[in-house]
Curated annotation (Swiss-Prot):
Family: Belongs to the protein kinase superfamily. Tyr protein kinase family. HCMV ganciclovir subfamily.
Chain positions covered by the region annotation Disordered: 1-29
EC number: 2.7.1.-
Keyword flag Transferase: yes
SUPFAM superfamilies recorded: Protein kinase-like (PK-like)
Pfam families: UL97
Described purpose of this protein according to its UniProt entry: Phosphorylates the antiviral nucleoside analog ganciclovir.
Composition skew (Polar residues), residue ranges: 1-11
Full protein name: Probable ganciclovir kinase
Active site, renumbered: D297
Binding locations of ATP: L185, G186, S187, G188, S189, Y190, G191, M192, V193, K202
Positions with biased composition (Basic residues): 12-29
One GO process term, biological-process aspect: viral process
Length: 546
């Protein structure tokens, strides 16, 4: 144990120091981590996003943008409800096992309303397998081409079940992309992403396939798609339009690039960018307020775009590997898998803040809570508004970096090196730490990320940043953690001294004089200023509206 001292020479609690690795330096790449905080010995960092300096030599390469990260949930649900077997074979049950006309009428009504009401028959409400003659019905799968949500009602209980069809033709065509000479778009701990004739083929694990299938079915149904729809973009959300749960393969469409790699920012296109930002904000609102799903991994790399000459033609939010249903729906959401006739419950949502978001894009309020309690859960209070605003705050961190890139007179590449590299270096430090083994060190890493968020906030909002800093400083002081309080102050003061506003001052003034620019800055400030729980109660529809 080593006794540490604060800059004011105050003694703090002893810390377990990290073991030093000889001959290895930390790779300077921002990353995200999805950890199993309970009952897992297999804790691995996920794919990292390179710093600007790391990709300079690759600018000439045409890269795909389907960059994904692997999902690992914290805990499995109760084993009794994880896999509910549907004992009836789909191949021998084309219709309801009831009397002729009434059964046919009931089936058609089910397909029209996408709802079915069942009697409990003195069974547990979670034992959906008791109703397999109705649920596992070949006629349902024959009517859909992509994952689709159906509501199951048993007495007063309701379940959201996404039917996932299995197409042998797609399986033979896409489930062995290496043999089909598919081009590699990206790779990581989640597996590989390939491009085969503009079809993005993603290989993942069972848990990620489950949550991705569920999100796909819910978004498709809530957006009002037809049962036969094969589209994979709804409300600016990119979802898979086909899933093979046998081989853990999902299909969607490819895009030109992602926001991290996009460098052609131009101030004269600010109206176009604001419109795109509004569409992305609407995607977050739809996902949370309508679908009751937290994205939990909004970042530059997870926003895919088509663009031409500095104009963003289309932008979509992608990658649901870390997505979680709002906790009040735990145990009530699942997927019905045609290929093996099983109902699989969607993994339980624990809402652990240290498991949510890339640390570099994590909302400041989340970092603030982590600095007091590393294992804290996000308290959504069963209110989708809080969950929605949390995702919007992460989206605002993305927009902040985009605006800074647009305003830097030296160009986007210099802006990335000058303003982003330190943030992503701190973020990487947090990614490489296991908060269970090294909770104090993880806190310190998050503290430095939070300080850098304040520095970048002050680049655009230099008058408001003082109040923000003092609010956070006083909060940490009241919590009694003097070492973290002083680390925040030291990092913020030192990093602020190193960063100049000069490269963005002229264009920043131009943006402030532009009508849409004023609205953009105002909306951005409102979201970035959310640093208390009460702030999360604000109307999520009040910002970034076309």
């Amino acid at each position: 144990m080593e006794q540490l001292k604060t800059p004011q020479n105050q003694k703090t609690r002893p810390r377990n120091m990290l073991p030093k690795k000889k001959g290895k330096e930390l790779k300077k790449r921002p990353c995200k981590v999805k950890r199993k905080l309970f009952g897992s010995e297999n804790i691995r960092p996920n794919k990292k996003i390179p710093l600007a300096s790391d990709v300079d030599n690759e600018l000439e390469k045409k890269r795909g943008s389907m960059i994904r990260k692997r999902s690992e949930t914290d805990l499995c649900p109760d084993p009794s409800v994880t896999d509910l077997l549907c004992h009836e074979s789909l191949t021998v049950s084309p219709k309801f096992e009831r009397d002729g006309l009434s059964a046919c009428t009931e089936f058609e009504n089910f397909m029209d309303t996408r709802k079915i009401v069942l009697s409990r028959n003195e069974k547990s409400v979670t034992d959906l397998s008791a109703h397999y003659p109705v649920l596992c019905n070949l006629g349902i799968f024959e009517r859909i081409h992509s994952p689709f949500l159906f509501s199951i009602h048993i007495d007063t209980q309701s379940f959201s079940v996404v039917y996932v069809p299995h197409k042998e033709s797609s399986c033979s065509q896409f489930c062995e992309p290496e043999k089909n000479m598919a081009r590699i778009l990206g790779s990581g701990s989640y597996g590989m992403v390939y491009d085969l004739n503009n079809v993005a083929i993603k290989a993942s694990d069972d848990l990620e396939s489950c949550i991705s299938s569920y999100v796909s079915g819910v978004v498709r149904a809530k957006a009002g798609a037809q049962l036969t729809s094969r589209e994979c973009v709804f409300k600016s959300l990119l979802i898979c339009n086909s899933v093979c749960l046998n081989h853990k393969i999902s299909l969607s469409k490819t895009y030109d690039t992602d926001l991290y790699k996009f460098t052609d920012w131009k101030l004269e296109n600010v109206e176009n960018y604001y419109s795109i930002f509004c569409n992305l904000a609407e995607a977050v609102r739809f996902l949370n307020m309508v679908c009751k799903i937290n994205h939990c991994d909004i970042s530059l790399a997870n926003i895919l775009i088509h663009h031409k000459e500095g104009i963003i033609l289309e932008a979509v939010l992608a990658d649901y590997s870390l997505a979680e249903v709002h906790p009040q729906y735990n145990g009530k959401c699942g997927i019905l898998r045609q290929f093996d006739h099983r109902i699989q419950i969607v993994p339980k949502s624990y809402n652990k803040l240290c498991d949510m978001f890339n640390p570099g894009f994590r909302p400041m309020i989340a970092h603030k809570i982590i600095l007091v309690e590393v294992y804290a859960e996000f308290d959504g209070k069963g209110n989708p508004v809080r969950h929605c605003n949390l995702d919007l705050c992460a989206l605002a961190q993305v927009f902040l970096l985009c605006v800074i890139r647009m305003l830097d007179e030296r160009g986007c590449r210099e802006a990335q090196k000058y303003y982003e590299n330190r943030l992503f270096t701190y973020s990487n430090e947090a990614c490489t730490l296991n908060p269970i083994k090294y909770p104090l060190e993880y806190k310190d890493a998050c503290c430095k990320v939070l300080a850098e968020h304040l520095v970048l906030f002050g680049i655009l909002f230099y008058r408001e940043v003082v109040d923000m800093f003092e609010n956070l400083y006083d909060f940490l002081h009241a919590s009694g953690d003097l070492s973290v309080r002083d680390l925040l102050e030291e990092t913020y003061v030192n990093d602020s001294r190193d960063v100049r506003r000069q490269p963005i001052r002229y264009r920043h003034a131009q943006l402030q004089r532009h009508e849409i620019g004023q609205i953009l800055l105002n909306d951005l400030q409102q979201l970035l200023s959310i640093i208390t729980i009460s702030d999360l109660e604000k109307d999520p529809y009040s910002v970034f509206r076309v």
